[in-house]
Amino acid sequence: MSQDNHQAVLRFDRVTVTFGDVEALSGVSFEAFEGESRVILGAAGSGKTVLLKTALGLVKPDSGEVYAFGENLTAMSERQLFDIRSKIGMLFQEGALFDSLTIQENVAYPLLNQRSIHCPPERVLPRVEEALEFVELGGTLEKFPSELSGGMRRRAAIARAVVTEPPLVLYDSPTAGLDPITAHTIIALLIKERDVKQTTTLLVTQRYQDGNLIANFRYNSKQGCIEPARNGARRTMPTTFMVLRDGRLIFEGGQDELEGSHDPYISKFVKQRV
């Protein structure tokens, strides 16, 4: 425990993951604390998605250890991992909605199929409705994913990721393939989720604009919108940026330090700020 005595929600200790002869992650170590936001930048193939899947226990490290909520995931069986995963929301890069299910059924899926959730049957629909209202999709219960726009499908996937009210949420490139206005809407929802529910947030992205919004905006519950706030002003914990290159964590720190870096690899992300 550190960072002003906040509890570490997620910890990587010298984690290495290999696929064949390729090291997808190489000796990665970091801690994410309660209520902290972490923005993970890196080029395609740098290990960002592998890091999230390792945090979820979907990928086992070849060496090193991963801890979530103080428990060692590396030593767990698949059955034991189910309980941990019920505390982690995950938005996969492709959204991964079930095309044959309605939006209501998609969002309800974690409540009905994660054994550790214990949601009473009479509470499932209200929880689904609440999650969809939260992402401003209240009128889509009976629609199918194919009837929604790309941005709306992404918002429905966010609703499914947070319907169980997890304390840790992992987002894998939530704005990929979206136009700038829709991308801004998605990040605004992530900020809303973070600040209203006080979640720990890990955001993987190639877009520095996304990280800049996460770091410098907060949700105003009275106004019902996000508003500018200096990095760290929204609460005691500032946003931490991480940069991966070829599976290695080459940067971990605050936004000012990131923007002051002279590393050309890092600089190319910072130039995307506007």
Locate each region found by the language model.
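Catalytic Walker B motif of ABC-type/P-loop ATPase nucleotide-binding domains
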Residues: 169-172
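Conserved ABC ATPase signature
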Residues: 144-148, 152
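Helix-to-loop junction immediately C-terminal to a conserved catalytic motif
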Residues: 56
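Conserved ABC transporter NBD signature motif
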Residues: 64-72
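Conserved catalytic motifs of ABC-family nucleotide-binding domains
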Residues: 165
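Conserved ABC ATPase "signature" region
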Residues: 71-72, 112, 119-140
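Short coil-to-helix segment of the ABC ATPase nucleotide-binding domain corresponding to the Q-loop/switch region
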Residues: 101-109
